[in-house]
Every structure is written in C-alpha cells, then in structure tokens.
Amino acid sequence: MLGLLGNTTLVCWITGTALAFLMLLWLMALCLFHRSQEHDVERNRVRQARPRLFHGRRLRLPRLVHHHHHHHVTGVTSVGVHHHHHHSPHRLHHHKHHHRHHHAHGARR
C-alpha cells in the first residue's frame, strides 16, 4: 500500500510540474500576443490620425471628371474637361481660385 501511495505522489508531482510549466508557457505566449496587438493598435491610431485625403493615394486611379463638375447642365459631355489638371493637395486652395476665375470668364478657349 505504501508503494502505491509513493507512486501516486510521484505521478502527482510530475503532473503538477508539467501543468505548471505548460501554464507558464501559455501565460508567456498570451503576454507576447497581447504586446504585438498593442503595437498594431498604435499603428492603427497613426493611420487614423492621418487625414483621409492622403489615405491610399498611391493606389487610386486618376478620375476623369472632378466631383465639382456635377453641377453643370445635364446632357453636357466631358469633352471640355481636359483643361482641368489634377493638383496635389497643397495646391488645392489655388485650384479653387483658378476654378472660379476660369468659370467666371465663361471657360473660353
């Protein structure tokens, strides 16, 4: 009977040690995974902090018609759109002045 009790104690010690070791590994993996997610959250915050204007600019195809041309008379084709240029964001203010000036003079060629 004493031999069986000694074997059971030994098995319990080995099982307990193995479980403790596995839980320690699991805890370390959990901490490392959580830390990597914190870095992703920081990167996402940086992405969200950037203005939408700059988000994904490299992949966007050029537009044929600007959004501010939609107020023109319906039925007019985009034949006269070629005189407009795509401007970089820092020249947008200048473009609005040019646009008003251009349409104030009847958009003559």
UniProtKB/Swiss-Prot annotation:
**Which organism does this record belong to?**
Mus musculus (Mouse)
Q: How does it sit in the membrane?
A: Single-pass membrane protein
**Where mainly located?**
membrane
The record ties this protein, via Pfam families, to: HRCT1
Upper taxonomic classification of the species? Eukaryota, Metazoa, Chordata, Craniata, Vertebrata
A GO cellular component term found in this entry reads:
membrane
Reply yes or no: does the keyword Transmembrane helix apply: yes
TM region positions: 13-33
Q: What is the protein named?
A: Histidine-rich carboxyl terminus protein 1
- Biased segments, Basic residues type: 81-109
Q: Where in the cell is it found?
A: Membrane
Q: Which InterPro entries match?
A: HRCT1
